[in-house]
Amino acid sequence: MNIYKPIRKTHPIFKIINGSLIDLPTPSNISSLWNFGSLLAMCLIIQIITGLFLTMYYTANIELAFYSVNYICRNVNYGWLIRTLHANGASFFFICIYIHIGRGIYYESFNLKYTWMVGVIILFLLMATAFMGYVLPWGQMSFWGATVITNLLSAIPYLGTMLVNWIWGGFAIDNATLTRFYTFHFILPFIILMMTMIHLLFLHQTGSNNPLGINSNLDKIPFHPFFTFKDMIGFIIISFLLIFLTLTNPYLLGDPDNFTPANPLVTPIHIQPEWYFLFAYAILRSIPNKLGGVIALIMSILILIILPLTFFKKIQGIQFYPMNQILFWIMVVTIILLTWIGARPVEDPYVFVGQVLTIMYFSYYIINPMISIYWDKLIFN
């Protein structure tokens, strides 16, 4: 009889929450690397709340945008805090999502195909949102970043120029561009929220992967209380780091050029995106051809989709494949070095290093399955 059951098991809405956060059967051996999903949810909520307060004072107009952000920081109660939390919150969002994806590659969680595909879509949406958010303060780097990145579409044969003008809403970046970027920057986080729910829905169809990469149905425990407390440790650490950065060095990850109002007549010496796009920007710059660069840029993220198709191993997870582990960490270092190269000027040693690193980055996805097949032959034959 339902009368004796707790409300979380009988109420139509609470039942869904209960199945996702309280009574969810969870592998008992998942490590701290499995915390990052919930940390990403926390980051998203922080971004939506701080963004909502910022949008109350922000003005999407090229004459007023820069000064409205200035006004928020100087005159609004705790406006400086809300703005820097929002800007640095985005950085933490990307740190968490990159670790989350890295964990997915390391333990080969991409075999949960639907979850993985939705995750890649979320990554694209997040990148689009962050890019458009960077344009909103309408500083020098906002303006020129928007100019450079939207101009990449002109590399598309035949349709390119028309497409760029369509996105700009005119023949140059103007008020129409800022207004539409603001519109999409506002709506996309809610689409990300919806996609996150779909991501979770697919995950809960199959259950989580675990550090051993084997079926854990024999040894599952309820999510609450053990993993709720374990997640809370992650929340506290990330919240502390975010608040520490925001209160000690809030503009550390920003660009000094963005303290100057946008001026179409003066080009900054070195145009670069925020740090979390630098690896992709370095890949873009490594290809001498414009269209080739754009394709490489998109493929640097889209290549994640092919991972489930390159799985030919007998055991899941590279924790049992020493050579693949070395290869994985080389790839991680490659991405860090690409991030460094993206922030360097387009000069001789940097260009060549960027090209070498780009080849190394893409070759990981080719060499990794080959090495694992070779290792399987060594072990099983």
Curated annotation (Swiss-Prot):
Pfam families: Cytochrom_B_C, Cytochrome_B. Keywords: Electron transport, Heme, Iron, Membrane, Metal-binding, Mitochondrion, Mitochondrion inner membrane, Respiratory chain, Transmembrane, Transmembrane helix, Transport, Ubiquinone. It is found in: Mitochondrion inner membrane. It is a multi-pass membrane protein. GO terms for molecular function: metal ion binding; ubiquinol-cytochrome-c reductase activity. Heme b b566 binds at residues 100, 199. Heme b b562 binds at residues 86, 185. It comes from the Eukaryota. Its cofactor is heme b. A ubiquinone binds at residue 204. The keyword S-adenosyl-L-methionine does not apply. GO terms for biological process: mitochondrial electron transport, ubiquinol to cytochrome c. The chain crosses the membrane at residues 36-56, 80-101, 116-136, 181-201, 229-249, 291-311, 323-343, 350-370. GO terms for cellular component: mitochondrial inner membrane; respiratory chain complex III. Coiled coil: none annotated. The main subunits of complex b-c1 are: cytochrome b, cytochrome c1 and the Rieske protein. Component of the ubiquinol-cytochrome c reductase complex (complex III or cytochrome b-c1 complex) that is part of the mitochondrial respiratory chain. The b-c1 complex mediates electron transfer from ubiquinol to cytochrome c. Contributes to the generation of a proton gradient across the mitochondrial membrane that is then used for ATP synthesis. This is Cytochrome b. It comes from Ostrinia nubilalis (European corn borer). The lineage of its organism: Eukaryota, Metazoa, Ecdysozoa, Arthropoda, Hexapoda.
